[in-house]
Amino acid sequence: MRVVLLCRYDGSGYHGFQIQPNNNTVQEEIEKALKKINKKDIRVYMSGRTDSGVHAYGQVLHFDTELNIPNEAWKKALNANLPADIRIFGVTTSNEDFHVRYNSTRKTYHYKLYIGQNVDPFLLNYVGQHKYNFNFEKAKKTLNYFIGEHDFSSFCSKNSSVEDKIREIMFSYRSEEHTSELQSPAMI
């Protein structure tokens, strides 16, 4: 049976998603949880990798298993065996023709940049910081060079099984202003 997961994680304490020797990774934690449930090693496949310290709001994964467990029970069992910074939010099954990497049609990335000297400590792990004046117009103009279809062959390994290396990059921009004003209830 092929089980498909929707996973969310805070990557602050991990060296990326993919297993690496001598480094703690998200994939390693998920595979350890699956081993506890399945009583044997289970390989997890991902739709894409994240780098060290990067978070995921909707990473799609799959694995194959002989266990026939209801979807909600998979979710409950996995979350019970995963660290609190990795959560499974959705579970479904699929036929064996589906592969998260090869059937993925889109990936969305969010980059958050805090402009200013005093970033809120609760945002530190979730934003990049630029301490001085930032030219938004120049940044948007530069990002326009990336928009459109591009050939990513030079980023693939020689043995890559991916046939179509053309990808389309789209861009959207949103600005939000945050206040550093402290709002806290009185403590007694």
Regions found by a protein language model. Give the residues of each.
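Structured-RNA-binding interfaces characteristic of tRNA pseudouridine synthases
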Residues: 1-180, 184
